[in-house]
Amino acid sequence: MNIDDTTIERCMMKLLSERSAGSSICPSDVARALASDETVWRALMPAVRKVAARLAEAGVVRITRGETTLSPDEIDHGPIRLRRGPGFVAD
């Protein structure tokens, strides 16, 4: 299964649109929405984080750990959450 960055981004935006403005999602929510097989969704996690980093740089999403907003270069390890950024536009 080949899942590209555009597909990951669309899924991420859809999941964030379905939540209230102050809510967050886990990157694994995105991966699991794209692939139900654990081996496959786990393999998608680096790509999901890469897309999240790109969208964070553009201000579309915020990457957080607890209540702290992280810069994209701080997400190579550890738990993170994704929230709507100031440039987020709901569908």
Regions found by a protein language model. Name each.
Residues 59-65:
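A short, conserved structural fragment
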Residues 66-91:
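Short, cationic-aromatic polyanion-contact patches
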Residues 2-5, 89-91:
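Long, charged, low-complexity intrinsically disordered regions
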Residues 3-24:
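Positively charged, polyanion-binding regions of nucleic-acid-associated proteins
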Residues 54-58:
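Basic amphipathic alpha-helical segments that dock to polyanions
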Residues 12, 27, 86, 90:
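Metal-cofactor-dependent catalytic cores
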Residues 35-50:
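Short, positively charged loop/turn segments that connect secondary-structure elements
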Residues 23-34:
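Short acidic, hydrophobic short linear motifs in intrinsically disordered regions
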